């Protein structure tokens, strides 16, 4: 789950990290009231979306007065911001974050991610922060410095000092950086984050380090013990189908193909998409119905897939381990009838009572194409998408 910048900075402030004062508005009428809470005569105006690249897309601007702030809010509120990290439709802008400004002498980059190989958290820092960090990663990887922290012990002061020295910071700035490193380390571990990014972390002419931007992603699997973070979730930033799928504990990710995929198990779902591509097709989605593929969940899965107008065929690939394939077959038939599916449906069943399941499908009056293997299922689905069924 992603947080907005203003939400991330509220967490930063709670952990004693240096941020500038800011406030959020949700309408043009709120701009004057919001700016009255801030000092200074100019502010940074930032569209709040769950995507990077806002600056290059025009979603971040330095506004010189209240009138310019109003104009920025009027331009963006209710619109969609398209960046290199969004799809072609972009993300809806429902909030503008106004923040006090500061002069900048130097920009740094600082982030933390989970390294699954070492089963530890890796902090990454660079002396080249700002909007072009992607180019630094690609063209100058030697400018990236890393330290690994053990989740059992957390970040240690010497690690912060080590990173600070590599960034060319000494004296007071070294201590400030170490304090920021320690605070971010506590935040990352205590809140079960999967990603934390400060870009840029800036050095002001007065010699102070300030977190000018903040990006946080929380591990979805840990949200059950972080009700405070769950309350910050903004479902408007999710694909509408993905949000609907969450209600029924379905894992759905929208793609841009025309073959809808319904599979039980994430690994099998990825394998199914791979083989569809191998046979020349394009998956319209990733959809994992999980181990408990009940009739209700299968019906909801069909409904969600069919909300995508580009879907020309649905491929159902079920391995009956925990669930029996005969029950799945009956569920698929009932779901197809309930939903009123009007596109071809290809079903491949394997595992417990698979033959019985295929027989139930064959004897039904529902127009379902059955496959004996995953290869045959992919071929049938690709041909059906081409209108050759």
Curated annotation (Swiss-Prot):
UniProt binding sites for substrate: 264, 321-323
GO cellular component entries: cytosol; succinate-CoA ligase complex
EC number of the protein: 6.2.1.5
InterPro entries cross-referenced by the UniProt entry: ATP-grasp_succ-CoA_synth-type, ATP_grasp_subdomain_1, Succ-CoA_synthase_bsu_CS, SUCC_ACL_C, Succ_CoA_ligase-like_bsu, Succinyl-CoA_synth-like
Keywords of this entry: ATP-binding, Ligase, Magnesium, Metal-binding, Nucleotide-binding, Tricarboxylic acid cycle
Domain ATP-grasp: 9-244
Cofactor remark: Binds 1 Mg(2+) ion per subunit.
Entry keyword annotation includes Nucleotide-binding: yes
GO biological process terms on file: succinyl-CoA metabolic process; tricarboxylic acid cycle
Domain of life: Bacteria
Residues involved in Mg(2+) binding: 199, 213
Transmembrane segment boundaries: none
Pathway participation: Carbohydrate metabolism; tricarboxylic acid cycle; succinate from succinyl-CoA (ligase route): step 1/1
Oligomeric and partner information: Heterotetramer of two alpha and two beta subunits.
Function: Succinyl-CoA synthetase functions in the citric acid cycle (TCA), coupling the hydrolysis of succinyl-CoA to the synthesis of either ATP or GTP and thus represents the only step of substrate-level phosphorylation in the TCA. The beta subunit provides nucleotide specificity of the enzyme and binds the substrate succinate, while the binding sites for coenzyme A and phosphate are found in the alpha subunit.
Similarity comment text for this entry: Belongs to the succinate/malate CoA ligase beta subunit family.
Protein name as it appears in the record: Succinate--CoA ligase [ADP-forming] subunit beta
Organism from which the protein derives: Haemophilus influenzae (strain ATCC 51907 / DSM 11121 / KW20 / Rd)
Organism phylogeny: Bacteria, Pseudomonadati, Pseudomonadota, Gammaproteobacteria, Pasteurellales
